[in-house]
């Protein structure tokens, strides 16, 4: 079922998209988002996420980084969240000479 859903998306990516002048305002592109959503979440939820993404993609959309929920890149720690305060190399106490 997944491969059947991915077939028209792959056709679009390799046969149609390269001939189009416009580019997706999101990263990953809407077609790549659909592939990742279907592969990660399955046909039903992935198809729903892909459809919701396509509805968010329009000329007035802000665009930018919009990963598939639950993917590795989306769950990676943000800057500063992986630091343990006890592992700091800077001392907070001052020594007097």
From Swiss-Prot:
Location in the cell: Cell inner membrane
Q: Which GO terms describe its cellular component?
A: plasma membrane
Task: Please give the residue ranges the record annotates as the region Disordered.
Answer: 68-97
What are the alphabetically sorted keywords of the record?
Answer: Cell inner membrane, Cell membrane, Membrane
Bias (Polar residues): 72-97
**Cross-referenced InterPro entries, in alphabetical order?**
Membr_insert_effic_factor_YidD (IPR002696)
Which Pfam families is this protein grouped with? YidD (PF01809)
- Per the record, the coiled-coil ranges are none
Instruction: Give the way it sits in the membrane.
Output: Peripheral membrane protein
Query: What does the UniProt record say this protein does?
Result: Could be involved in insertion of integral membrane proteins into the membrane.
Q: Which NCBIfam families match?
A: membrane protein insertion efficiency factor YidD
HAMAP family xref list: UPF0161_YidD
Name the family the entry cites: Belongs to the UPF0161 family.
This chain belongs to the protein called: Putative membrane protein insertion efficiency factor
Q: Which organism is it from?
A: Marinobacter nauticus (strain ATCC 700491 / DSM 11845 / VT8) (Marinobacter aquaeolei)
């Amino acid at each position: 079922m997944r491969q059947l859903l991915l077939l028209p998306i792959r056709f679009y990516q390799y046969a149609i998209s390269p001939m189009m002048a416009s580019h997706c305002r999101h990263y990953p592109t809407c077609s790549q988002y659909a592939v990742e959503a279907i592969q990660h979440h399955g046909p039903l939820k992935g198809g729903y996420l892909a459809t919701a993404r396509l509805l968010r993609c329009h000329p007035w959309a802000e665009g930018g980084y919009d990963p598939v929920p639950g993917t590795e890149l989306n769950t990676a720690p943000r800057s500063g969240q992986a630091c343990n305060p006890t592992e700091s190399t800077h001392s907070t106490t001052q020594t007097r000479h």
